From Swiss-Prot:
Substrate for transglutaminase-2. Cyclized forms account for about 1% of total statherin in saliva. It holds the Pfam family Statherin. The gene is STATH. GO terms for cellular component: extracellular region. Residues 20-25 are annotated as: Hydroxyapatite-binding. One of its GO terms (molecular function) is hydroxyapatite binding. Keywords: Biomineralization, Isopeptide bond, Phosphoprotein, Secreted, Signal, Sulfation. This is Statherin. The modification Phosphoserine is found at S21, S22. It is found in: Secreted. There is a cross-link at K25-Q56, K25-Q58 (Isoglutamyl lysine isopeptide (Lys-Gln)). Salivary protein that stabilizes saliva supersaturated with calcium salts by inhibiting the precipitation of calcium phosphate salts. It also modulates hydroxyapatite crystal formation on the tooth surface.
Length: 62
């Protein structure tokens, strides 16, 4: 019984992998694979951590 469950899961995995790769081949053949994506645009660098709030101090002249 355990062997049948293992064989069923293995067959299901193989069929899903095959279905995914055939879809990619189909989309590549009709020229729509990656459609809608523009050229590479670098992501602007952001600080690793949010900066603490820095209040603007008013400078008084004495």
């Amino acid at each position: 019984m355990k062997f049948l469950v293992f064989a069923f899961i293995l067959a299901l995995m193989v069929s899903m992998i095959g279905a995914d790769s055939s879809e990619e081949k189909f989309l590549r053949r009709i020229g729509r694979f990656g459609y809608g994506y523009g050229p590479y645009q670098p992501v602007p660098e952001q600080p690793l951590y949010p900066q603490p709030y820095q209040p603007q101090y008013q400078q008084y002249t004495f």
